[in-house]
Amino acid sequence: MIINNKKNNKNGQHQHITNEHPVRLSPPLEGLGEVSSLRHSPPFGGVGGGFSTVILAAGDFPTHVLPLHILRTAENLIVCDGALEDLLEYDIEPTAVVGDGDSLSEELKQRYAHIYHPISEQEFNDLTKATLFARSHLKMDASTHTRPRFCYLGATGKREDHTLGNISLMLYYYRQLAIDPVMVTDYGYFVAASGTTRFESFPGQQVSIFNATCKELSSNGLKWDIYPFSELWQGTLNEALSNEFTIQADGDYIIYRTHKI
């Protein structure tokens, strides 16, 4: 089964994020992504590489034009069951609905029975259940070992513990599931990264770095020098000086960047 929601797209295009792989330099794109070792990461704003899947969680529904554009034009849209009602208010149809079903009315379960995939186990939250479902239904490029690119929307807001958990899952998906995850909010976007990576940016863009496993951590192109942070707050509230910056690292970390518009 290949999940595909293209028939529901009126525009046929969607926002993209470039690939993030070690020792790679990608050409500049007006999308969203990274460059690592050196890998490349353009700013969010145009059309670049494609998303394998867009996953909508049941946090605050997007209101910013960029995540809404991604949502409306996604080819493969997997929705956590708790977000289905909000999605339908925007007249957007999902490719699949995933979850334990406790957030769905019987009417919606029957209406979407053909694409509803109940998963009752309790070890993972609905965001991870949706990710595992999408991951298992994608054809992978074994010859190039290309990571699929997943975009996460509606994954912040409402309960703060869910927000913190969902952000931390970006590294779990990156390391354990071999995908390139990007969490897009109304204010900016989070990406998981590893090793030395060059990130496209813009002057004045607000940047935060959250260290996970780095014992060596430095930067070029940011207003304030960084170091191997031992606390999450220590890498917040930095600023890009130009159209790109580079993180030199020997481990994993999460980067947050604000939208330009």
Language-model-derived ranges and their functions:
Residues Q13-H16:
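N-terminal, intrinsically disordered charge-dense segments
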Residues T63-V65, N125-T128, R159-L164:
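Short glycine/serine/threonine-rich phosphate/pyrophosphate-binding segments
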Residues F51-R111:
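N-terminal beta-strand-loop-alpha-helix module at the start
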Residues A113-A142:
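Short phosphate-binding loop-to-helix
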Residues A193-I261:
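Long, charged alpha-helical interface segments
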